[in-house]
């Protein structure tokens, strides 16, 4: 399971011109699910994301987590995080989990976050989305539950 975690001032997702999810200060998470992912990957990434100390304290040090600041989170499914561009010019998405299986793991991930964070928004799984991200910093972290980064 892969995630691009961005510290944001605000973020929103639109589908067909209508806002389906929006947040204020917190994290925008683009989430990719692979064929090898299990509930253990969900647990690992959830704990890592909500406890990442990427928010500044009173001394401007990155010492606070999403939970510490009471921040929001928006989670957007993005299978293209498993695009393999090593051969040719067209990405291969063979490692990405598709369809119903990915939808189930995505929802389990979202539900696990909702147990820890008050304001959780999402995109629409499988939809063509417009994602608006107002970065803060910017601070962007790449995470992989298989630790390949």
From Swiss-Prot:
Q: Where in the cell is it found?
A: Cytoplasm
* Keyword Kinase listed: no
Location of the motif Gly-cisPro motif, important for rejection of L-amino acids: 137-138
Species, as recorded? Clostridium botulinum (strain Hall / ATCC 3502 / NCTC 13319 / Type A)
List cellular component terms (GO).
cytoplasm
* Official protein name in the record: D-aminoacyl-tRNA deacylase
Spell out the Pfam families in the cross-references: Tyr_Deacylase
- HAMAP family in the record, alphabetically? Deacylase_Dtd
Q: What is its EC number?
A: 3.1.1.96
State if Ribonucleoprotein is listed as a keyword: no
Q: How does this protein assemble?
A: Homodimer.
One of the entry's Gene Ontology molecular-function terms is: Gly-tRNA(Ala) deacylase activity
Biological process according to GO: D-amino acid catabolic process; tRNA metabolic process
Give the domain note. Answer: A Gly-cisPro motif from one monomer fits into the active site of the other monomer to allow specific chiral rejection of L-amino acids.
* The entry's keywords: Cytoplasm, Hydrolase, RNA-binding, tRNA-binding
Q: What does this protein do?
A: An aminoacyl-tRNA editing enzyme that deacylates mischarged D-aminoacyl-tRNAs. Also deacylates mischarged glycyl-tRNA(Ala), protecting cells against glycine mischarging by AlaRS. Acts via tRNA-based rather than protein-based catalysis; rejects L-amino acids rather than detecting D-amino acids in the active site. By recycling D-aminoacyl-tRNA to D-amino acids and free tRNA molecules, this enzyme counteracts the toxicity associated with the formation of D-aminoacyl-tRNA entities in vivo and helps enforce protein L-homochirality.
Query: What is the name of the gene encoding this protein?
Result: dtd
Q: Its catalytic activity?
A: glycyl-tRNA(Ala) + H2O = tRNA(Ala) + glycine + H(+); a D-aminoacyl-tRNA + H2O = a tRNA + a D-alpha-amino acid + H(+)
What family is this protein classified in?
A: Belongs to the DTD family.
Q: What class of enzyme is it?
A: hydrolase
């Amino acid at each position: 399971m892969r995630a691009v975690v961005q510290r944001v001032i605000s973020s929103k997702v639109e589908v067909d011109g209508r806002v389906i999810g929006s947040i204020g200060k917190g994290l925008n998470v683009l989430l990719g699910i692979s064929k090898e992912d299990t509930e253990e990957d969900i647990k690992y990434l959830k704990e890592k994301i909500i406890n990442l100390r990427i928010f500044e304290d009173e001394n401007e040090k990155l010492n606070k987590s999403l939970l510490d600041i009471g921040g929001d989170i928006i989670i957007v499914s993005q299978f293209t995080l498993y695009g393999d561009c090593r051969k040719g010019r067209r990405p291969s998405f063979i490692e990405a989990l598709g369809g119903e299986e990915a939808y189930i793991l995505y929802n389990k991930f979202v539900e696990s976050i909702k147990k820890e964070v008050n304001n959780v928004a999402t995109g629409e799984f499988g939809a063509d989305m417009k994602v608006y991200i107002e970065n803060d910093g910017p601070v962007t972290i790449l995470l992989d539950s298989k630790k390949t980064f």
